[in-house]
Swiss-Prot record:
Keyword terms: DNA recombination, DNA-binding, Transcription, Transcription regulation, Translation regulation
Assembly and oligomerization: Heterodimer of an alpha and a beta chain.
Name by which UniProt lists this protein: Integration host factor subunit alpha
Region (Disordered): 87-129
UniProt xrefs under InterPro entries: Hist_DNA-bd (IPR000119), Histone-like_DNA-bd_CS (IPR020816), IHF-like_DNA-bd_dom_sf (IPR010992), IHF_alpha (IPR005684)
Its biological purpose: This protein is one of the two subunits of integration host factor, a specific DNA-binding protein that functions in genetic recombination as well as in transcriptional and translational control.
Gene Ontology molecular-function annotations: DNA binding; structural constituent of chromatin
Taxonomic path: Bacteria, Pseudomonadati, Myxococcota, Myxococcia, Myxococcales
């Protein structure tokens, strides 16, 4: 799907003109981009969370030569889908209280981040019942 496809969808479903639809879509993407550039998290209920994470500089290895190389510190964008989206992708009924499950996942992810760890969602499935 492209940005043009999204604009077309807004045009067809909402009834705005194509110009208005394009302006709305551009505004949404600009807002998302600015939020992420500030380092703020984006939480979209029933869809997922976008977050910018800081990666530390580290020593890596060139796979072709085996030579060690410095990989500089950088910011990376991560996306964690909600339980509702994961269920939809797997053809399952959405969880009864997806907001509660999303909140538990978010709390677990925040706790892992505070400890300097990556969040592993696989363990969360046991908590979902």
């Amino acid at each position: 799907m492209t940005k043009a496809d999204i604009i077309e969808g807004v045009y067809e479903k909402v009834g705005f003109s194509k110009k208005e639809s394009a302006e709305i879509v551009e505004l949404v993407f600009d807002t998302l981009k600015e939020t992420l550039e500030r380092g703020d998290k984006i939480k979209i209920s029933g869809f997922g969370n976008f977050q910018v994470r800081q990666k530390k500089a580290r020593v890596g290895r060139n796979p072709q030569t085996g030579k060690e190389i410095e990989i500089s510190a950088r910011r990376v964008l991560t996306f964690r889908p909600s339980q509702v989206l994961k269920s939809a992708l797997n053809g399952e009924a959405p969880p009864e209280d997806h907001a509660e499950i999303d909140a538990r996942e978010e709390a677990a992810a925040d706790a892992a981040e505070a400890r300097g760890e990556d969040f592993d969602e696989e363990g969360m499935e046991d908590m979902e019942g």
